[in-house]
Regions:
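NTP/phosphate- and nucleic-acid-binding module
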Residues: 1-180
Length: 180
């Protein structure tokens, strides 16, 4: 039985022998990015005892990686709140990626921002723009806004002059959510 020997054939022809090889490296980000998103995704039951279930979808992204860092939300679209909110957004967009949202109730806007992973929501309300209370006394909350944290849903009142520094410190001191 005759068998063909490639090595012997190459020697007889005087050709060099080559061993074919292929190195194909792949460093795709699709799986890694999907894993990153799945790890950050959470559905929380935020219903109070005795109430029907109410789930909140949250994307717990690190603030340095979130597509939107700060959302500016006027409490209402009227009475000068929207204009003041736009002014604040303009101030913040020099340092952060911002979003401005006026559609729906403020609670629904918070939920939408939680879903896309926005770590901070700045709410502009009547205390932000009114220098005096209805009784004529000075308003201590004038030129302040409410900052809401995505992960804990806690809210904190912050002076407009300190807002950029406050958010920068909050980003620097961010602690990831630990889930069981």
């Amino acid at each position: 039985m005759n068998t063909f020997n490639l090595f012997k054939s190459d020697q007889e022809d005087g050709n060099k022998k080559y061993v074919p090889y292929v190195i194909e490296t792949s460093a795709g980000l699709n799986r890694n990015f999907l894993m990153f998103l799945c790890e950050a995704y959470e559905e929380q039951n935020v219903a109070k005892e005795g109430e029907p279930e109410d789930y909140r979808t949250v994307l717990h992204l690190d603030p340095r990686l979130a597509p939107i860092t700060v959302a500016v939300l006027p409490l209402m679209k009227k009475d000068g709140l929207a204009e003041k909110a736009k002014e604040i957004q303009h101030m913040l967009k020099e340092d952060f990626v911002t979003d401005y949202d006026t559609s729906g109730t403020v609670g629904k806007r918070y939920r939408r921002q939680d879903e896309v992973g926005t770590p901070f929501c700045v709410t502009v309300d009547y205390d932000t723009i009114q220098e005096k209370k209805e009784d004529g006394t000075p308003n201590d909350l004038f030129n302040t806004v409410t900052v809401r944290y995505r992960d804990s849903m806690e809210q904190e009142r912050v002076a407009l002059d300190d807002l950029v520094t406050f958010i920068q410190k909050a980003i620097k001191n961010y602690k990831p959510v630990v889930r069981a």
